[in-house]
Amino acid sequence: QTQTSYSVVYLPSEISITPKPLRMEMFRSTGAPSELTKHTDSWFDWGIVDSLMCLSFFQYLNFSRPGNEKHKEVAMYNMIHVIKTGLRYFHRDTAFNLLGYSFMHENQLTNAYSCFNQSLKIRPYHNAAKFYLGLLFNRIHATNRGHTHYGNSSDISS
C-alpha cells in the first residue's frame, strides 16, 4: 500500500519549528473571522504547503549555505518545476510565495516580484505575498538609497 501526503501543515502551536517563510503564511490575514466564515477560514492561521513544494523548498534551505551552489541551483529548479508541472497541488499561492522568497534571498528581485504578483493573482486576499512585497519594496528602496534594508532574508534556515 502506498500513501501520499498532499499537504504539509504547520499549526500556530508549531511556530517555533516552522521555517520563517511558512510563518509568514500563518499571518496571511488580519482581524477576526466573521461569524459566517469562522468555520471555513480556520486554516488562515496555518502554514500550508503542498508536499512536493515543501520538499523542494527544504532542499533549497539545506543547500543555501556557501559551498553548495550546484545543489542550490538544482533545488531552485525543482521548485520552478513543481510550479510549472504541478498537476495535483492545491496551494499554488504558497508555492509562488516560497519561490519568490527564495529569489529574494538570491537577490533576484525581479523574479521575486513576479512570483509574489502571480501569487496575488491566485489569491488576492488573505495572502502573505502582501508582506513579502513590502519587504521586497523596502529592499529595493534601501538598495537604491545605499542604506541597509529591513527584512534581511539572509538567515532563512531558522
Predicted features and spans:
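Nucleo/cytoplasmic regulatory scaffolds in medium-to-very-large eukaryotic proteins
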Residues: 1-158
